[in-house]
Amino acid sequence: MAERSYDFLMPSVNFFGPGVISKIGDRAKMLGMKKPVIVTDKFLEGLKDGAVEQTLDSLKAAGVDYVVYNNVEPNPKIRNIKEVKKLYEESGADSIITVGGGSAHDTGKGAGIILTNGDDITKLAGIETLDKALPPLIAVNTTAGTGSELTRHAVITNEETHLKFVVVSWRNIPLVSFNDPTLMLDVPKGLTAATGMDAFVQAVEPYVSVDHNPITDSQCVEAIKLIETSLREAVANGHNLDARTKMVEAEMLAGMAFNNANLGYVHAMAHQLGGQYDAPHGVCCALLLPYVEEYNIIACPERFAELAEIMGENTDGLSTRDAAELAIKAMKQLSEDVGIPHSIKEIGAKPEDFELMAENALKDGNA
């Protein structure tokens, strides 16, 4: 008999591989979408033959009308989701397609939440607070990555208080996700590093979570191996399709893992840094990871010793504690190799803000 029971959440359909973006029009039509709001940013919208252009071409070919919202910001704000809601209602839209990285997906999810569950999203922060389904949602992913294209998390920033909060619900999971690595070949080095380290953290945290299970363990292990062997190359040579493909596989695995085994204090604290200083989420996560996990070693040293081996470190002859410390060293080295800043000072962190951020981190859905 199993020692415990657990739920396992996944999107119903995931398209993966070079060229799959061409299928989005037919899939949107199959879902009954007649006029989706395309949620993206100006940069992606302006790319010739980029993700947005290919999405729109496929929709046109399938006879699906659309309207475009192109004002997605990093660390999406409440004002962004309200803008999408307004466009949705005024244009007579019936669905949402997000095109971008985590910010686009969170903006689309946030808009969907307030379209059906009430206008004040701050009251919905927490776990499984949504009573009503979102409008039909498809996510086209362009970074590897937050995993937001297939998870139940919507992360929004209150621009007035600088508080970053999470709405966690199975209702947020997109009906369909698209991960086409050819759309990621021109992602800049800095963004590749930041999003890649976010994926790494999202594989590490569920592995040492109290909610881990055999399914999520296998996903975390493979994701960590893929990132350890592919992220450096993806940063150094963005047009290496094999490295990009492996990073997409890794971020999908990590996303499925933390969708079920959850995250932890790295993300709870990173949300506060990002909300307070509008700093890149992946950079915040990477900066905090080794220090939070060094603190956590005492809770499960054997899991961290396993992480060292998964990352390719030689633990022969080492005590469990020493092997666990080797995992922390390997985490720092990976961040160093891909150009992550060395200190939170470099993203503008100020000691006078620490107490408030600590209080808010304890209220975060990942704490």
Feature map (PLM): residue ranges:
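ATP/NTP phosphate-donor binding region
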Residues: 1-95, 344
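Short glycine/serine/threonine-rich phosphate/pyrophosphate-binding segments
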Residues: 21-24, 47-49, 78-81, 103-110, ...
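A glycine/threonine-rich phosphate-anchoring loop and its flanking beta-alpha core
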Residues: 22, 116-212, 303-306, 310
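Short beta-strand/turn micro-motifs composed of small residues
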Residues: 39-40, 100, 157
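A short, small-residue-rich loop immediately preceding and capping a beta-strand
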Residues: 88-128, 134-142, 269
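Active-site segments that bind and position negatively charged phosphate/pyrophosphate groups
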Residues: 206-330
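C-terminal charged capping/lid subdomain of soluble metabolic enzymes
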Residues: 304, 314-367
